């Protein structure tokens, strides 16, 4: 299919720049994936669509405050570093600006010297492998010195960094939030659990590739970025049992879907304990083996994520729903409203 087939007109003012005061006060568009019927509701209405014996699968990754500002030791030049992916030991793949100032062997100091880095390798497109040195625990140092790496379409400063974390975030490693999960509070999850719905966690560390535009004309030629995922034995067994008993598997976010479908596609539809890297690209024509329904935000035109949701329903129904969302002034992207495709 052509990438252009997934385009739609989006007024810039519908791109949410800040989160709502209350996480659960977002709107919820409910889309019947087969008929295309649309209902405009509130996010807390999600409870009525979840039944006893269903599974609600959430991604418990935690966003790192991965943007660092430092000084090149040799010249005093200001350097911005964005952590992308942990390599061996204290080495990280990073994006450096301005990259031309940091060559192999160059050193950078952050803050008052609590964190230092040396460039081990130069990569293309401003990428650098940096090895960090510090006292104590790396993630605690990051909390002191780093900033949240908000998506490029969000222009306003975030007053409270916790609003770009889910309330259940636990596993450090993401460069961006699994934003469908931002709508949940502990109270809402407790109400869902009390209804007999099983709350199950997976882990997928979201990379910055999630914001990278698709730069080919035909979707068949697109190569996905890789992201680390993990599913525990307990979670795999619980989901398999629910499916065997006829319960629905409802994924919260495209990252949860990518985790479950990666594993199911390798094991004849079954889920097993597994960790690794996935480059799964889900687009129309894909046959889902693990997931029945999806809670997600509204995605960018021509993005791999709108292709994924089109695979769960179909392209014409999704684009009709998106056009309805524009007409009804839904809020889009990371801090925007939600959609339930079932």
Curated annotation (Swiss-Prot):
One of its GO terms (molecular function) is S-adenosylmethionine:tRNA ribosyltransferase-isomerase activity. One of its GO terms (cellular component) is cytoplasm. Its main location: cytoplasm. The keyword Transferase applies. GO terms for biological process: queuosine biosynthetic process; tRNA wobble guanine modification. Its EC number is 2.4.99.17. The keyword Cytoplasm applies. Pathway: tRNA modification; tRNA-queuosine biosynthesis. NCBIfam families: PRK00147.1, queA. Transfers and isomerizes the ribose moiety from AdoMet to the 7-aminomethyl group of 7-deazaguanine (preQ1-tRNA) to give epoxyqueuosine (oQ-tRNA). Monomer. This is S-adenosylmethionine:tRNA ribosyltransferase-isomerase. The gene is queA.
């Amino acid at each position: 299919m052509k990438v252009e087939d997934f385009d739609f007109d989006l007024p810039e003012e519908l791109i949410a720049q800040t989160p709502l005061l209350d996480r659960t006060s977002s709107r919820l568009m409910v889309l019947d994936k087969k008929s295309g019927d649309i209902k405009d509701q509130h996010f807390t209405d999600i409870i009525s669509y979840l039944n006893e014996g269903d599974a609600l699968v959430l991604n418990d990754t935690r966003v790192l405050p991965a943007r660092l500002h430092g000084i090149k030791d040799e010249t005093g030049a200001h350097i911005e570093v964005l952590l992308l992916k942990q390599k061996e030991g204290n080495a990280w793949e990073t994006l450096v600006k301005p990259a031309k100032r940091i060559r192999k062997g160059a050193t950078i100091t952050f803050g008052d010297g609590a964190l230092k880095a040396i460039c081990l390798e130069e990569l293309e497109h401003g990428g650098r492998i940096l090895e960090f040195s510090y006292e104590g625990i790396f993630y605690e140092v990051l909390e002191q010195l780093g900033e949240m790496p908000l998506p490029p379409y969000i222009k306003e400063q975030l007053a409270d960094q916790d609003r770009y974390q889910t309330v259940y975030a636990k596993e450090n490693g993401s460069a961006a939030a699994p934003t469908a999960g931002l709508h949940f509070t502990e109270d809402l999850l407790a109400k869902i659990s009390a209804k007999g719905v099983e709350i199950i966690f997976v882990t997928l560390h979201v990379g910055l590739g999630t914001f990278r535009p698709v730069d080919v004309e035909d979707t068949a030629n697109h190569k996905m970025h890789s992201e680390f995922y993990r599913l525990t034995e307990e979670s795999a067994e619980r989901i398999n049992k629910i499916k065997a008993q006829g319960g629905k598997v409802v994924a919260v976010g495209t990252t949860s879907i990518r985790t479950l479908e990666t594993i199911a596609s390798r094991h004849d539809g079954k889920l097993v304990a597994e960790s690794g890297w996935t480059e799964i690209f889900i687009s129309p024509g894909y046959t889902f083996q693990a997931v029945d329904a999806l809670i997600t935000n509204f995605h960018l035109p021509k993005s791999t994520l709108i292709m994924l949701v089109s695979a769960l329903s179909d392209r014409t129904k999704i684009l009709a729903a998106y056009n309805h969302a524009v007409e009804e002034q839904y809020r889009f992207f990371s801090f925007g409203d939600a959609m339930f495709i079932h």
